[in-house]
A protein has these predicted regions:
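N-terminal secretory/targeting leader peptides
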Residues: 13-14, 18-130, 143-347
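Secretory targeting signals
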Residues: 1-14
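A gly/proline- and charged-residue-enriched helix-loop-helix capping module
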Residues: 132-141
């Protein structure tokens, strides 16, 4: 249950607070010179490296804009690569529980906390990251906001569609999935792989390179935008790039209590610089990076595209799973049918 401590969790969080406090004293992960302290400072934590496109091209410029518009009264200090401690699946709860001020992460890392968001990962929800991001915000207040208790969503955007990247066995037809161990980023996308006959393996993106290289997994389900950021073209040989698979949503969320305690003028700076507009910048970066990944893979890797008939076979294989997910949500008291209908997933 969101926000409820499990046995032994208090000690873990206490230790983590100690680790983070030490990290804050020693880490110089900020876009501002040491000594240029503002009246308010927000610490944003993530698993991505500082070279990641969203970190470098969206969040860093945003933090600079916040400092400029607030005239130095508010700064956002960026901590990449899990510098404040913990593991990637813990990022959202770190922020939700006030251990950090904000985070950039995936809802899919803790799918049980985001039952409505999980439905947006199903196949057929969008035609591009831009399209998917607009749909996320169009459905946010009515369907998705309930997943974000204790936080304020600053950014929410879609990735490009997932691809299948494999080292030794290409995926050209539905039958090729049988028995393949494929990395998945979330429970929602695990269900897609099971529907196709594969064996899903939960794994954060930071473990894909070594796992694929050593044969721990046969393939990874991941967008082409990640191929360059995480150097996956070095280890994968086959890329099925136009499969009708789902898309991972990403988010930047802030602790709600921390936001509410900001002065009104600084809340306005946050409000004016985030939301759909900033989210669409993230989507644009993913769409552009996806094409860059495809172009890079073309040089000495095999790109696989599916016929319209084969794509339809996959979509038919997904329908029972989509219907089951919708019914499970309804039984749990969630407006799952309304969201599935809003996306037109069952026709």
């Amino acid at each position: 249950m969101i926000g409820r401590s499990r046995p032994g969790r208090n000690n873990v969080l206490t230790n983590r607070r100690t680790i983070i406090a030490g990290s804050l004293a020693t880490t110089a992960a900020t876009v501002f010179p040491r000594g240029a302290w503002a009246k308010e400072e927000l610490k944003l934590h993530s698993f991505v490296p500082p070279t990641h496109i969203i970190w470098a091209r969206v969040l860093t410029p945003w933090s600079q804009e916040v400092a400029k518009l607030s005239k130095g009264e508010l700064t956002v200090r960026l901590f990449p690569s899990m510098q404040l401690g913990g593991k990637p699946p813990e990022l959202y709860r770190q922020t939700q529980q006030g251990i950090t001020d904000a985070t950039f992460t995936l809802p899919g890392y803790t799918s049980a906390d985001f039952p409505m968001m999980a439905l947006t990962e199903l196949p057929g929800t969008a035609t591009s990251a831009d399209d998917g991001t607009k749909k996320l915000w169009a459905n946010f207040d009515k369907y998705l906001a309930r997943d974000y208790k204790g936080t304020k969503v600053l950014m929410l955007w879609n990735s490009d569609t997932a691809s299948i990247m494999s080292k030794s066995k290409p995926v050209r037809r539905l039958e090729d999935f049988k028995g393949m161990k494929i990395r998945t980023p979330s429970a929602a996308q695990s269900s897609q792989l099971e529907a196709l006959g594969a064996i899903p393996i939960d794994m954060p993106v930071t473990q894909i390179y070594n796992s694929l290289d050593r044969g721990v997994i046969d393939a990874s389900m991941i967008p082409m935008s990640a191929a360059l950021d995480f150097k996956l073209i070095e280890v994968a040989k086959y890329f099925t790039v136009d499969a009708p698979l789902g898309r991972s949503p990403f988010l930047v969320a802030m602790n709600l209590n921390r936001y509410q305690k900001l002065p009104a003028n600084l809340k306005k700076v946050i409000d004016d610089t985030t939301g759909l507009k900033l989210s669409l910048k993230g989507a644009a970066e993913y769409d552009a990076q996806s094409q860059a990944g495809i172009e890079a893979a073309k040089k000495d890797r095999e790109l696989i595209t599916l016929s319209a008939q084969e794509r339809q076979r996959w979509m038919e294989a997904f329908k029972p799973m989509i219907r089951r997910k919708m019914e499970e949500g309804e039984k749990a008291g969630l407006p799952a049918r309304g969201l599935v209908d809003a996306y037109g997933l069952l026709g």
